[in-house]
Amino acid sequence: LRFFLADKPDAIVVEFFSGSGTTAHAVFRLNRQDDGRRSSISVTNNEVAANEQKALRESGLRPGDAEWEQWGICEYVTKPRIRAAVTGRTPEGQSIKGEYKFTDEFPMADGFEENVEFFTLTYESPLRVSSNREFAKVAPLLWIRAGSRGRRIDDISRGWEVTDTYGVLADLNLTQDFLNAVRADEAILLAYIVTDEDRL
């Protein structure tokens, strides 16, 4: 990755079929080497290996069951690996032994100064989202689109909210209050309007 991203400290790396999370791990390491702020988005389908699927089906389990999903590559390999890379600790809480080698040697137990979020994508009813009953489920996507920096807006029950780099307006009757808050903060780069109002 260094060959392609060395001169792109703010790059966004998207990997589909991310497997064990090697690309995200490499982005963390590259950021540490050059103080970059690259983001990595890893997408996987949490596939369970064919031989394990057979045994799980024979025991009465099906895709979607928690006991099935725990053996998928994302749940069993990717998430634990990424958490361990960032924290420097195993899933059992022990410091990781060993050091990273070559370009920059340092203990794996040091971890990385990275923010990590895991999301399970689902299909949501537009009516429930537009009426704010499911806003928390789309909130992470808005935060990612706004740059994945700072606090995430998870609740807009008061009609609007502003955070470090973006704002969300849900009640058009409160537009002026929202605009005043946005104007008062030069760091805000993006505003979302979440509504089903016909007057727009």
Residue ranges and their predicted role:
Residues 1-11, 31-200:
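Accessory, often C-terminal, charged low-complexity segments
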Residues 10-19:
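Conserved class I S-adenosyl-L-methionine
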Residues 21-25:
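Glycine-rich SAM-binding Motif I of class I
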Residues 26-30:
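Hydrophobic residues on the short alpha-helix immediately C-terminal to a glycine-rich phosphate/catalytic loop
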